[in-house]
Amino acid sequence: MSYLATADPEIAELIECERLRQVNGLELIASENLVSKAVLEAMGSILTNKYAEGYPGKRYYGGCEFHDRIENLARDRLKQLFNAEHANVQPHSGTQANMAVYFSVMECGKDRMMSMSLTQGGHLSHGSPVSFSGKMYEVSQYGVDLKTELIDYGAVEEMAKKVKPKVIVCGASAYPREIDFKAFQEIADSVGAYCMADIAHIAGLCATGVHPSPVNVVNFTTSTTHKTLRGPRGGVIMCNEEYGAMIDKAIFPGMQGGPLMHTIAGKAVCFKEALQPSFKQYSRQVVKNAQALAETLGEAGLRLVSGGTDNHLILIDLSNRGLTGLEAEVALGKAGITVNKNTIPNENRSPFVTSGLRIGTPAVTSRGMKEDEMHQIGEYIIRVLKDIQDEATISAVKNEVTALASRYSLYPPSL
């Protein structure tokens, strides 16, 4: 930081403040994680100096010979990790990865997609009216059964037969249960549609077999690399070789220019890390931790959407507590516990307020915490939510959070 501190002390100070926030607190946002020092080093490298429009062996600029090797390593490692036929590592984000699939197989203003409603667990880029996807395509959305709070595959099939979409999107940002990707592809096949699985949240779990993988099951698989994969912020697309050329064309020149080669290098590093046996142990622990935390919260009387979790996240319904998600998020934040407000099935509040909280275990698991610590964290959450106006309790919990965090380095030896 010495160069930055000299050149721009304001930015250096703010980065240090954020470092201390992460060090001293507990990161329980389900979409966040910690990258390794190796990934950080790759992302901060001189690769950021170079333009590399195009693909390996077909660049529009000279001097890309090392960039070609880096991108090929990233692609090959991703294919090995997921046993994929074709991989594109250039998307700047998961949303752009999704956009590339849509652009490849749908006609703007004409074709229809079918996807999970945002309020019931989906994602903005899956056809929300405020997203490009909802503005450019016709959209029909499915949800969960309001009694079980699970995806009703029969209802999905019934809707598909009625609306006849060009693409069926599966995958979610706030669904705590296992997704049956094979069932979605079979439904898509029955109506002549493509199926796209967005595994941004569960990619690390899918890569290690902790959650069933959609790769080679559905037509297209998209993901981010920064959640359970524990890599840099970015996106990827995997598909069968028959779709590879049109996907690559949709990314470049379709919607992006030069790839972010420093980020692609970071992706390559994270894919290598995910291929190690220790990463499978990590993925298993993420789920064990989520289930341990869910057990503690549920036993204390908090209502868990669907009754628990099969993956890395927990969705809490605060309706019966007289709290909003926003109020709970703010109170827990004061105690050093970072979570996010989230809509729940049958939501009746604004997405800026919500009736729910989303909690995840990837980041605290990366710090080395296990089930015992999850029970402890669950108790912290319960104490704060019991009375969010009790500043003395919030202060006491914050001190305990800091003490717990101090025992688990932000960068343990495994990172």
Swiss-Prot record:
Residues holding (6S)-5,6,7,8-tetrahydrofolate: L118, G122, H123, L124, S350, P351, F352
Cofactor field: pyridoxal 5'-phosphate
Organism per entry: Methanosphaerula palustris (strain ATCC BAA-1556 / DSM 19958 / E1-9c)
GO MF, any single term: pyridoxal phosphate binding
InterPro entries cross-referenced by the UniProt entry: PyrdxlP-dep_Trfase (IPR015424), PyrdxlP-dep_Trfase_major (IPR015421), PyrdxlP-dep_Trfase_small (IPR015422), Ser_HO-MeTrfase (IPR001085), Ser_HO-MeTrfase-like (IPR049943), SHMT-like_dom (IPR039429)
Name of the protein this chain belongs to: Serine hydroxymethyltransferase
Alphabetical keyword list: Amino-acid biosynthesis, Cytoplasm, One-carbon metabolism, Pyridoxal phosphate, Transferase
Function as written in the Swiss-Prot or TrEMBL entry: Catalyzes the reversible interconversion of serine and glycine with tetrahydrofolate (THF) serving as the one-carbon carrier. Also exhibits THF-independent aldolase activity toward beta-hydroxyamino acids, producing glycine and aldehydes, via a retro-aldol mechanism.
Cellular component terms (Gene Ontology): cytosol
Gene3D superfamilies in alphabetical order: Aspartate Aminotransferase, domain 1, Type I PLP-dependent aspartate aminotransferase-like (Major domain)
This protein's pathway: One-carbon metabolism; tetrahydrofolate interconversion; Amino-acid biosynthesis; glycine biosynthesis; glycine from L-serine: step 1/1
Family assignment from sequence similarity: Belongs to the SHMT family.
Catalytic activities: (6R)-5,10-methylene-5,6,7,8-tetrahydrofolate + glycine + H2O = (6S)-5,6,7,8-tetrahydrofolate + L-serine
Residues the record lists as N6-(pyridoxal phosphate)lysine modifications: K227
EC class (word): transferase
Transferase keyword on record: yes
Site keyed Plays an important role in substrate specificity: positions: H226
Enzyme Commission number: 2.1.2.1
Subunit structure, as described in the record: Homodimer.
